[in-house]
A protein has these predicted regions:
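Long amphipathic alpha-helical segments
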Residues: 1-66
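Amphipathic coiled-coil/heptad-repeat helices and related helical stalk/stem segments
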Residues: 32, 127-128
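Residue-level preference for short coil/turn positions at secondary-structure junctions
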Residues: 44-45, 82-85
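A broad, low-specificity signal marking well-ordered, structured residues that form hydrophobic/aromatic
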Residues: 49, 75, 87
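Beta-hairpin (beta-strand-turn-beta-strand) motif
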Residues: 54, 80, 92-94
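Short, structured interface segments
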Residues: 66-80
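Glycine-rich phosphate/diphosphate-binding loop of Rossmann-like nucleotide-binding domains
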Residues: 84-127
Length: 128
């Protein structure tokens, strides 16, 4: 996949009130950088920018762009204003932490306060 094959939906926020995200898995580091840089410099949008599922090389390169929040394999820039909701993220176990962390960064980029409860698997329902 060349950088020419990446098609960002820069009008997405206007249409559905959700920002475009860069799903890094399967892309080169250069493609991820190009996509995030294009969104950062887009004059028509000041919405949150989210890059998810970055590998170590992609994460390091994207981190150089000065994200507002970087956690796990997800980075975000230009967060939305604070919302009135606090959202709980509950994961079953350590295998789910990557997805829980991705949810945390995404929700916080959208302006929500979050809290996380981990390792609440089937054998631990009493911990709810």
């Amino acid at each position: 996949m060349s950088s020419k094959e990446i098609r960002l939906d820069l009008d997405r926020t206007r249409r559905i009130n959700m920002p475009e995200a860069v799903y890094c898995e399967g892309k080169t580091t250069d493609q991820c950088l190009e996509a995030v840089k294009e969104m950062l410099t887009n004059e028509n949008s000041s919405d949150a920018i989210i890059a998810t599922r970055a590998n170590e090389e992609q994460f390091s390169a994207l981190f150089e762009l000065g994200p507002t929040l970087a956690y796990g394999s997800t980075l975000s820039w230009r967060h939305r204003p604070a919302q009135k909701f606090t959202i709980g993220i509950v994961s079953a176990g350590t295998l789910d932490l990557r997805v829980a962390n991705e949810c945390k960064v995404t929700l916080e980029a959208l302006g929500h306060t979050t809290f996380t409860i981990t390792d609440v698997g089937v054998s631990g329902l009493h911990r709810l």
